[in-house]
Each structure stands twice: as C-alpha cells, then as structure tokens.
C-alpha cells in the first residue's frame, strides 16, 4: 500500500510487504488482549481490519488513489453459481470432482493478477489444543507472533489463469477440480493466499523484500523455508476458507437404460410376488378338484399348473429367490438414480411396495389360476435358472417338513364351509339341506328321530279283523303296525297292511292267525345306534321298521330292556333330506313336534259304511257299498261330486229299495221279469249291475254281448230332456224326417260291456219310431205338453242271479235337491231336517201319470217266495 502515517505508521512497507503488515498488526493486538476477550478479537480481526485500514486512509487524507502500485487485499470467496454438485454447506464450499467451479473473490484492488495469489492446501490450519492453554491464563502466543504458513499447495485444484473483474472490489475466477484418489469419498481443502504476487517484477518473484518481526527473506520466524518457489503462502484468516470436494456422482448405466431396467425389474418383482401368493394358494387338492369338475377353461388352467405346483417347496424357493434378487437389483438402481437420502427411500418404497407387492398380489389373489397358467413358462424358466440354489433348499425342506398334502376338510369344516358360502354358491336350499343331513348322519342316534312309544299306532294281539278293525287300520295310514300283548311296551309281532289283502272282514279272522302265518321278524336296536348304521340295516332288506330299546339299570333289581319307541326308514330319510315326507294319510308333519297336517280334502270316513241289519232289505257288505259309492262318484257323471254330494249319494244308496235282487229262472229264460230293459219301452230309472251277468242286445242288427258287474244303463233316463209328443207331431212325422233323424251322425253309442259307460240310446230316430205306435194309441191319456220319457234302443236280460242298483228319476231329482240344500249355508238342525224330508219324498211322493204308465209296463210280479223283483215305484 501507499504510506498512511496518520492511521498506522508501522504498516508502511514497500511493494508486496504491505500485505504482510496486516497479519503482524493483528497478532500484536491479540497479545494485548486478555484471555477472556481473545476469541472475540480473533473473529473480528480478519473481517474488520481491511475496513479499518480503508477508513483510516481516507480519514487522514494520506491514502492515495488506487493505482497499479496499490497492494491487493483478499477478504473472502463465494460460490458464484450453485447446482446439484456445487453449493454452500455450513459456510464451506462443497463441490464435486471433475468439475469446474466459478468463485467470486471479494477484496481491495482486485486486478488481473489476483488469481495468482490464491491457492489451496490439503492440510488444515493448526489450532491450539486445550492442553496448550493455561487454565484461566492467556493463550500461548503464536510461533514468533507471525501468520501460519500453508502446507504444501495441492495440485488437485487448479486455478485457471484468468479473472473477470468487477469495480476492482470483486472478481470471478474459475477453478478446476481433479478426480479424487482411489478409496476417497470426499476431501477437504483450505484457502491460502500469497504475501507477494508470484513471478511479478523484481520484488515479487522470489521472496518478501522486507521483514516481519525482525526476520529476513527466510519468511515467517520459526517456520521452515517456503515450499513453493520463492513465494510465501499463508492461511487465509477468514471463515469461508474451506472447500470440500466430493466424489463425482456416477450412474452404473446410462440413464435411459436404467429406466428400462427399473421398469422391467418392477414387472418381474410384481410377477414373483403375485405368483408366490397365487400359485402357493392353489393347493394340490384344489387343483385336482378343478381338473375334474371345473369349466373347460379352468380344467385347462389346472392341468398346466398342477405338475409345477406338485413340487411345492422347489416352486416356493425359486419364486422367493427370484423376488429377492429382483428387489435387490431394483433397490440398487433406484438408489443410483435418486441418491441415498430420504428421496431414495421414498421412491424405492413406493416402487416396490405398490407396483411390486400390493397390485400384483391383489390381482393374483382373485385370478391366481388364470395368471399362473398364462405365466407358467416364465415360472419354469426361473425355476431352471435358480435350480442350483433353490433345488437343494427345497429338498431339505421336504425332508424336514414332509410331503405337502393340501387342505383336507373334515365333516365339521366341510359343513361350516357350505353354510358360510351359501350366499355365493348355486346350491338351492333343498340341496344344501340334503348335504347337511348326510354329513350329520353319523352324529345323530335313533333316539333323536324315533317316534315315542306313546305316540305309536299299535294293535293288541287279541283283535278281530272285522270291518271296524280294518277300517281303523286303513284310517291310520300306516303300512307296518306293531302288535302288542298286555302292555304296549311288550311288542310281540308286526302286521303289514298288505297281509290283509286276502282277508274278508265278514269272516272276522283273529289277528293272531294272520301274524302267525306271515311271522314277520322283529328288529330291535339300541337307542345309541347311529343313523348311518341304522340306514345300513334298513338297506339289507330285513325290515323297514325297528324297535328302539335301552338297558334300564335304574333302581333296584336286575337291568332289563325298556322299549322307547320305533324308528322307520322314513325317519332316517327325513333326517337326511331335512324335511318331512307327507302322504295323504299323515296326521302330523313331525313325529316329535306333533304339528297337525292341513289336509286339503276331507279325510275318508269308513264308519259311514258300517250298516245295521235293519237298514237294507238286501244284504251287502260294507266293502261292496264302499266300492259302489266310489264307482258312481268317479265314473258316472250324473253322480259326480259336482252334481251330487257324496253324503247324499251314500244316503241314496242306503235306501231299502235302491239295491235289489233278481233270481234267474233257468226254465223261463225270456220271461218279462228277466228283462231290466226292453227295446222301445219307455223307462225312467238307472241300473248298475253289482253281481251277476246280463245279455245286452242293441241296434237294429240285434248285436248281442254279455256284461257283468259294474256295468250300468239308463243314465239318460235320469237326465232326459223334455220331448214334444203332441198328437199332431206324432202323426205328421214323415218317413223322410225319420230317415234324416236316424242319420249315422247322431249320438249313437251302443251299450258297452265290462263295466264301461253304456249309452242310453243308439239314435234319436229309433226312439221316435218306437214312440209313434205306442204313444199314438194313448193320445187320450197323454197331454200335448212335454213329457220326460227315455226309450232305450236296446234290451238288457239277466243271465244269472243279479244284484243291482235301481234309481228312478224321481229319486235322483230329490237327491239333487237335497244336495243343493246341503250346500246352502244354514243351521245344522234345519239342514238335516230338510234333507230327511226331501229323501222321505222319494217314497212318499205321488207318482204322476207317466210314472203309472211305466209301472204298469215294467213292474215285476212275485212268482216265487224269496225270488221276486221289487216294484220300481217311487221310494
């Protein structure tokens, strides 16, 4: 600097020695301070000293303008441009190797040669240790009270020989950072400045021209000679003097190639993770099931997966090893791109967890069969690639853990699985009940399903098989009935209803006779017998009914067998199907809850057919009365329930004159009394043959055939429509009308044998031809109004003794009226009274003229005792 005596006389030096006076003054100030304020002065000296010098020079007026001979003062460095590899961190510059960095130099008289006064060293500035300081005393002085020389100037940082000036107070220099040595991750360098401008003029090329602290060109007292040519370099006394050079960030691969590899590895990671869950979740048992009963696509998938899945441990080791290798490589590549900080952790976690774990496992958990089958070639490839490592480990696992069997369900688990999956499977409720019942068969005993003894229908062994007993058996609806003697628990025999097929109730056969003849074996079982064992016994065909007993050892005395109830095959089947089997004879829906069955129809009451001797003149059995009643109600439309109630029909059949007998006379086969119907003779009654044979002659051709029991005739006599029979109509019938009326297309239905429905008339023309001569001679007796007359065109003659039903039109009409009254809602007393009055009119009513005419022509006289045909007059 130029001389400045007013401010600092000791600092006046020539040429390059002015810069060296600054540290000397600072060191003198340090020695004059107390130990307590030493640190503060030390921190402020380096920054405030240049400013004090400048203010001193300007204030005293002794400082000259800056010129070419003015010394350069360097205050500090700052990083000009910051980026990913060059930045400020904690007051130090952090740069990367193999880079060029621009630094801004701050100071006074910055010129084009300032770059040559800056250097860096690898050695850190020496600091006093606590042991070198006195406890409570002042710090030991610096060596010879001079500045510290820099160590060897490093060659790793090269100062490029140019500077960009800015107002002589700052400039921009550029440095080049060379590569670090091997095994070095980072390295610290420290700023040094020279006391003179190197290689500049006579006074600056070799050494300092003045002395500092009484020493000559040897440099700072107490230090070895300067190592760099003849220039003295000292540590820069400031805070921003440290530069940290870090390792250059290198990518393992080019960036674009790394992105491709990362994407591929993410896909492989997801595949391994998904296959690990999807394939290992498919146990061998499930794959076999799918192979046998899945869809065609599922069968194909299972067939491709099953050989690989059979080697479970080998597959598991291959998938896990591949997954670990892929994830490790992926982590390294992501770390190389994102770095090793928090960003790298977040990126790696998101990439692996979301795209490598969550997404593929969510897909494979639902579509593992399809994904595993479509990627089976990749699975086999990686199993081959990892064979050296995964196969030995898998064999070790096989030896330690044993063979993999798969998921096996016992009865309880299978039943619970069906219940839990009920909303999602296609089983209907009945199918599910049957499956549950079959699975629970071995867990239940016969005592759980048996019918208790008190609720069983049983018959005493002393019973007589008359109509009352057999009716009771039929009404019970059971096919196998236990027979007891004395107490109900003493079951000695078994009666099958089919055993009564050849039993006549009129014979009053003792029950013991039937049971001893058939001698059905009794089957006893204990109350703890399982239902599956009971079903096997029933399947052997020994019996479909078993008697349940238990050993009673309660109380005093010897143990004995106690009968609890009976169990049937139907009970076991009902337990399997979880539903009650009801037929038309069941009384209860369940033999335990005793819930009544709601029958849609009235139950048949066989007691109505139990007749007394005084009710009928002709003795018939209750069975025949029942058969006759059912035949008329079902086969003859005129007596169907829609026309006449069954109760009224039964009362009609029980009237004394409805059922009649006719004794056949062998000597006089064609006597008038042997004819039930004669051709062209009007009648008003219906006939049903019960026993015997008749000969029917029908048509103009006189065709003859025989008929027997349950053939009937004269239905139209009961329901014949009114026919106009006026005298004028009778005598004006022409031959043409007769022929026209007798055309083959009109209602011709000759009588049929074998109990089939017989026609009432062959043709309307035949009836007209027959009516003309008969009614023409009786025109004085008949009115010109309508007459309900039925004229058969056939003859019915007895061929043997007959027993038949004969119902007149009047009786039928009264019965119809009684049926209508029976259906009309009214009090029961008035109803029964009116019905009885109506039925009484069947024989109390006065016959009209037509009835008298019919009676005269068809009444049969009693020629022999006990061989007569009852008069067909109104009942």
Curated annotation (Swiss-Prot):
Widely expressed, with highest levels in kidney, lung, spleen and testis. In the kidney, predominantly expressed in the distal convoluted tubule and, at lower levels, in the connecting tubule (at protein level). The modification Phosphoserine is found at residue 761. GO terms for biological process: magnesium ion homeostasis; magnesium ion transport. This is Metal transporter CNNM2. The chain crosses the membrane at residues 251-271, 339-359, 369-389. Residues 272-313, 335-338, 390-875 are cytoplasmic. Divalent metal cation transporter. Mediates transport of divalent metal cations in an order of Mg(2+) > Co(2+) > Mn(2+) > Sr(2+) > Ba(2+) > Cu(2+) > Fe(2+). The lineage of its organism: Eukaryota, Metazoa, Chordata, Craniata, Vertebrata. The N-terminus is cleaved within the endoplasmic reticulum. The signal peptidase complex seems to be involved in the processing, but the exact cleavage site has not been identified. It holds the Pfam family Ig_CNNM4_N. Isoform 1 and isoform 2 may interact with each other. It comes from the Eukaryota. Induction: By low Mg(2+) concentration. It is found in: Cell membrane. Residues 314-334 dip into the membrane without crossing it. Residues 121-149, 741-763 are annotated as: Disordered. GO terms for molecular function: ATP binding; magnesium ion transmembrane transporter activity. PROSITE patterns: CBS (PS51371), CNNM (PS51846). GO terms for cellular component: basolateral plasma membrane; glutamatergic synapse; plasma membrane; synapse. Residues 251-431 form the CNNM transmembrane domain. Glycans are attached at residue 112. The keyword Transport applies. Belongs to the ACDP family. Changing residue 591 to A: No effect on N-glycosylation. Residues 450-511, 518-584 form the CBS domain.
